[in-house]
Structures are given as structure tokens and as C-alpha cells.
């Protein structure tokens, strides 16, 4: 973890940010070390301890949340009573929301491991790579290539809702027409089929061509028959969008891949885009012609190489991706301890940090900006379309 060198003065920034947070003390690490998520918590604990092995690191106070909001609240209260100056974790959004008010009342900042941007507030930063961050990056990439009319086919789930909300916001920010969004029941293929048919406006598109063919046949002469035959060879008009956001993966994505050609949706008229989850499925996706060329935003895999190597050398196994958050949060804590403490001014310096998954900037309002790369699904493996930025332009948002 390192600071990104700044070429801009930050004096105006520093005067606008409240000096919230403690300057010193041990760092609390709140994780589910018992219950169903204990294996996740134990692995994240190992990742955090790697960062705290650095020379001059503050003491690390590991506490068990028991995998519940109530347990997280109790762990936070105990950590604060013990004099801890910063909280890393907890894992989930509900647990982080339980910890937030307790920490804020005690003048303690929180770096949570959730990826839900909705819980962000001054003093509480969700560090996970959020659906919103992914959508903003990939929709902007599509817009840069001239695709500006968006639509989405999303599961009726919390993840789908977050993707839909992010798409609406990004389309508005780019000055695009409000997107058409269809939600389907993830457990029903019939619901999925209806949603695809509706969003693609297939009935109207196909009906118009069919009506012209029938009218030609109704002429009941040679000219009409020739026209009908010619019209039958014409493609169905394109759908009313040129960018289609999908949130599905696995079997559901494969099902969508069979439906899209049937409803005449695909390249070059339509750019398919999707979530970071596609990074681990890109090669399988490339076996479906409808998905070849699809775009997704994700951290460059090579960036986490040093962390993976360090983790594997110490623990003898490869770390799951979620461990990146624990390592980066811990590294930020160690760096902040050397730079003046765990205050909002230190944590939200607009130069940001360069971590395991690339550049990230914590903002005073609790939002987190990330620099993600954009990849294209190709038969030979994912193709880098737009590299991840090494720094993000200033975008100072005041605390509210």
C-alpha cells in the first residue's frame, strides 16, 4: 500500500474536511470468527496480519463479531472501551450499520468490508468494489465508443437493485436517456424469458416486419409475392437500445445467451456489459457467441500478484479475492498511523492510495472511488480494453 504522489496542493482540501477521528491507539479488526462465515473471517484475519507485520505498525486488536449485527456492535463497543483508534470491518452491510453509530459517537472512523455504497456516511467507508463502481466504469467505456442508449435485464435481488440504481445514476450523469430496466425472478426461467422479450421490444419489432410481409402477400399477385419473399430476408429492426447491462453469471447467464439471438439482440448493434463477476467466467462465456465482445470492469489481475505471493509463502495457500480488502484496509491503517493518525483528513487525502486492487480514494462523505480496468470477453481470454488509471482526478466531495 502506498500513497499516490500528488502534483496538486491539498491546502484547500484540508481546510474543508472536518478533523474527525482519533490520532492514535490500537486498530480493531472486526470479523466473523465463529458461525457460518468463520472461514472467511479467519482468512481475512490472516491477510490483515500480513500488513501489520510491517515495522512500526500499531497493535492489532482482533475481535469476533459472531457473524451478526448484534455481535458486531458488541465487538465495536469493547474495542472502543479498550482505547482502539480505528475500526477495520465488519464484513457485512448490516453489521457495519450497527457499528457506525457506536463508532461515530466515540470519534472513531470505520473502514468496513461491505461493498454496499448505501451505507456510506462521514466516518464510515465501505471498501468493497461496489456494483456502482463497476457499472459507472463499464457504462462510461461503452459511451466512449458511441453507445449511449442503455437498457438492463437484472435479477430481482439486492444485487440487481444496486446495479439498476447505479445504471440510472450513470445514465443521468452522462446526459443519456433514462434506461429501460427489466427485473426477473432468478428462480423462474419463464420470468427471465418474459423479461428478455419485453425489454428487447421484440413483439413490436417483429410485428412490424410481419405486418409488411402479410400486406405484400395480400396483394395476391406476382409483385406482392416477390416483395413478401424479399421482406422475409430482411433482419428484424434493432432493439431500442445499444448497450445492454446484465448482472447474471453462471447458468442464468448461459440461458440469457441463448435467448438474446432468438430476440435478435447482439453485436454490432448492441454492446453487452456486465459485472466484475465475469472476470472468473470470461473463458466459459466466450463459448457463447452472444456474449463474445461483452465488457466488464474489474481490477487488473496482475496487481494482486505480490499480495498473493506473500500470503501463499506465509500460509501455504492462495487467498480468496475478499482477502484483498482486509490486507488493503490494514495497510491503510498502518500508513495512516505513520502520517498523523486515523483522522478523516489523513484517510481522505485526495491523492488516494494504491493498493492490491489498484487506486482507491476515500471521500469525506464516506463514498469510495476506485480505478478499474475494462476487459472484453474473447475466445482466447479476456482482452484489456481500457487500463486501470494509476491515479484519479480530484473529485472532492464535502462531508454532509
Segments from the language model and where they lie:
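Extracytosolic ligand-binding ectodomains
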Residues: 1-400
Amino acid at each position: 500500500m502506498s500513497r499516490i504522489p500528488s502534483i496538486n496542493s491539498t491546502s484547500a482540501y484540508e481546510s474543508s474536511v472536518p478533523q474527525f477521528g482519533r490520532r492514535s491507539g490500537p486498530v480493531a479488526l472486526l470479523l466473523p470468527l465463529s458461525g457460518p462465515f468463520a472461514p472467511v473471517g479467519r482468512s481475512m484475519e490472516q491477510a490483515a496480519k500480513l500488513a501489520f507485520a510491517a515495522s512500526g505498525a500499531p497493535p492489532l486488536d482482533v475481535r469476533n463479531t459472531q457473524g451478526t449485527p448484534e455481535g458486531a456492535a458488541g465487538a465495536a463497543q469493547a474495542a472502543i472501551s479498550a482505547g482502539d483508534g480505528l475500526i477495520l470491518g465488519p464484513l457485512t452491510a448490516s453489521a457495519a450499520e450497527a457499528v457506525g453509530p457506536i463508532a461515530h459517537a466515540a470519534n472513531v472512523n470505520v473502514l468496513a468490508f461491505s461493498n454496499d455504497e448505501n451505507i456510506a456516511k462521514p466516518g464510515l467507508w465501505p471498501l468493497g468494489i461496489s456494483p456502482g463502481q463497476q457499472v459507472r466504469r463499464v457504462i462510461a467505456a461503452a459511451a466512449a465508443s458511441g453507445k449511449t442508449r442503455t437498457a438492463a435485464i437484472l435479477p430481482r435481488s439486492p444485487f440487481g437493485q444496486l446495479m439498476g440504481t447505479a445504471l440510472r445514476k450513470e445514465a443521468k450523469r452522462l446526459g443519456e436517456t433514462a434506461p429501460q430496466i427489466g427485473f426477473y425472478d432468478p428462480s423462474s426461467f419463464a420470468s427471465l424469458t418474459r423479461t428478455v422479450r419485453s425489454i428487447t421490444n421484440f413483439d413490436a419489432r417483429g410485428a412490424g416486419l410481419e405486418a409488411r410481409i402479410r400486406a405484400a402477400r395480400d396483394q395476391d399477385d406476382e409483385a406482392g409475392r416477390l416483395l413478401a419473399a424479399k421482406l422475409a430476408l430482411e433482419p428484424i429492426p434493432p432493439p431500442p437500445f445499444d448497450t445492454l447491462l446484465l448482472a447474471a453469471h453462471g447458468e442464468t447467464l448461459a440461458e440469457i445467451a441463448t435467448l438474446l439471438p432468438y430476440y435478435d439482440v447482439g453485436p454490432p448493434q448492441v454492446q453487452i456489459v456486465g459485472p466484475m463477476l465475469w472476470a472468473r467466467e470470461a473463458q466459459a462465456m466466450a463459448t457463447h457467441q452472444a456474449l463474445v465482445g461483452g465488457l466488464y470492469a474489474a481490477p487488473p489481475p496482475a496487481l494482486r500478484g505480490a499480495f498473493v505471493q506473500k500470503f501463499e509463502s506465509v500460509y501455504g495457500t492462495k487467498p480468496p479475492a475478499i482477502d484483498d480488502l482486509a490486507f488493503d484496509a490494514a495497510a491503510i491503517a498502518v500508513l495512516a498511523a505513520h502520517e498523523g493518525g486515523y483522522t478523516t483528513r489523513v484517510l481522505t487525502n485526495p491523492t488516494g492510495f494504491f493498493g492490491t486492487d489498484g487506486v482507491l480514494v476515500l471521500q469525506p462523505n464516506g463514498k469510495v472511488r476506485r480505478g478499474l480496468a475494462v476487459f472484453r470477453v474473447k475466445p482466447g481470454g479476456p482482452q484489456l480494453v481500457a487500463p486501470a488509471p494509476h491515479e484519479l482526478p480530484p473529485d472532492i466531495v464535502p462531508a454532509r
